[in-house]
Design a protein with these regions (language model features):
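Soluble non-transmembrane domains of integral membrane proteins
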Residues: 1-7
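C-terminal helical/tail subdomains of lipid-metabolizing enzymes
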Residues: 8-44, 48-191
Length: 191
């Protein structure tokens, strides 16, 4: 079953190898799909042991597994703790919704890193070409302190962003990629 799903995924994503036919890739916020989009990877790792999964993937001549997790979790400024006024319904609903999601996100990121670490520990003992796993975790909260960090953490969830917010997020992405050691290791592995 897992092998059939892998073949289906491979066929579905093959067209993205043609940059002229499909020059753009639009991604969906993982929180909208399955909490960071990592759930399917983690489900797969729970169904098969690392040993079985490694053996299956060796059949496809893979050399690297690279997962780039972009955690765009915001931190909207609110000042409810600065006033004796009872918080409004919007503040209460945001708290009730965001706290459990934030905790699940944190747990998923930790589990994903643990999976990559376990995978790489297993492959150290393998002979020949190895399949290395890289888990690149980029979080807006890891930006250096300053106006850009404050601005991007206060961008609300939306299906449309004004160009000024897009520009700030691109600048933030560049900084996060530049400061990520794991990203640079993964990039080097692809060369």
């Amino acid at each position: 079953m897992w092998l059939n799903n892998f073949e289906t995924m491979k066929k579905r994503t093959a067209s993205y190898q043609n940059n002229e036919e499909k020059p753009y890739l639009h991604l969906v916020d993982g929180g909208l799909t399955d909490n960071l989009g990592l759930a399917s990877l983690l489900d797969m790792s729970n169904l098969l042991t690392v040993k079985k999964l490694y053996a299956e993937l060796k059949n496809y001549n893979l050399r690297n597994i690279i997962v780039v997790n972009v955690n765009a979790q915001n931190e909207l400024s609110n000042h409810i703790d600065k006033s004796a006024d009872v918080p409004g319904i919007k503040e209460v609903v945001n708290t009730v919704i965001n706290v459990p999601i934030d905790k699940t996100t944190e747990s998923t990121v930790k589990y994903s890193q643990k999976f990559a670490d376990q995978w790489n520990a297993y492959t150290k003992h393998k002979k020949g070409a190895k399949i290395k796993a890289y888990f690149v975790n980029l979080s807006l909260k890891d930006l250096p302190e300053g106006q850009l960090k404050n601005d991007v953490l206060n961008i609300g969830t939306s299906f449309y962003l004004p160009q000024s917010d897009v520009d700030k997020l691109r600048e933030a992405a560049k900084i996060l990629l530049e400061q990520s050691k794991e990203y640079h290791k993964a990039l080097k592995a692809l060369q």
